[in-house]
Amino acid sequence: MKIGFIGVGKMATAIINGLNTTSHDIIISGSSLPRSREIAEKLEVEAALSHQELIDQSDLVVLGIKPQMFETVLAGLHFHQPILSMAAGVTLERLGKLTDPNLPLIRIMPNLNAQILKSTTAICANDKVSAELLATAKEITDSFGSTFDIPEKDFDTFTALAGSSPAYIYLFIEALAKAGVKYGIPKEKSLDIVTQTVLASAENLLQGTDSPHDLIDKISSPGGTTIAGLLDLEKTGLTASVVSSIDATINKAKAL
C-alpha cells in the first residue's frame, strides 16, 4: 500500500518512522515543496509536488495537519481513497464534510510516545470502512505503539487520558526531581532516579494483577513514611487537581 502524508510535523514524522518497519511505501507533502523534499530526504521517503499529486498517487491519505488548518488546507482538494486523520477535535462527521462523507474515514489519536514507537493510540471509523481496511489501519498504528478501539464519543476523554497526560506525568516527574534537589541530590541524578522509578512502577502495574490501590497498600506501612506523604498529597487535593485538569482538557478538545 502507498500511504500519503499531508502535513509532516513531529507526530507524522514519528508515525513514518514506525511505518518504515513495514512494507508500505510512503509519500509526503508538507507546507512547501522545499520543506517536503528536506524532510523526505531525512526520512528516506518520496516527496510529492503538491497535496493533490500526493492524493492522486496514494492508496491511503493520512492527515497530519493541525485542526485549525483543516479548512484552509483541504479546500479544493479531491479525494478518492480512504482518509485517516489524527487531528484532535475533528470528528468523522466534520472530516466527511471537508472531504467526502461517502469515503472510508478513520480517526486516530496517538500521543508523543510515538517518537519511541510506544504510542497509546485510539482508533474509530465510519461505516464505510471495511474490516480489512480497519485491520490495515491498526497495523499502521501498531507499528508505533499499541491501539485501542474507542467509540468516537469518548475520543475527547481519551485525548485527555493518553494524548495530553504525558505532559502531566512529566510535570509530576519534574516536581519529584525538584524535591530531590531540595534535599541535596543533584538535578540530573534526581531526575534519573525518579524517571526509573516511574517507569518500573508502570511496568509493575502492567505485568501484575494488582490494582493501583493494592500496590499503594503494599508500599504503605502502618505509621510509615509513605502513608504520611500520601495523606499530605490528599490534603492538598492531588486527586481533585488531576480530575480537574482532565475536565479542562476535555472541555478544550470539545471546543476545537
Task: Name what the model sees in each region.
Residues 1-4:
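Extreme N-terminal starter segment of soluble prokaryotic enzymes
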Residues 8-9:
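Glycine-rich Rossmann-fold phosphate-binding loop(s) that bind the pyrophosphate
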Residues 195-256:
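NAD(P)-dependent Rossmann-like dehydrogenase/reductase catalytic/cofactor-binding core
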Residues 26, 36, 54, 186-194, ...:
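Small-residue helix-packing motif on alpha-helices
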Residues 94-104, 120-158, 170-209, 252, ...:
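Internal alpha-helical scaffold of NAD(P)-dependent oxidoreductase catalytic cores
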Residues 15-18, 33-34, 40-43, 47-123:
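Rossmann-like NAD(P)(H) cofactor-binding subdomain of soluble oxidoreductases
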Residues 165:
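Aromatic-residue-lined binding/catalytic grooves and analogous aromatic/hydrophobic interfacial grooves
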Residues 12:
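Catalytic nucleophile loop
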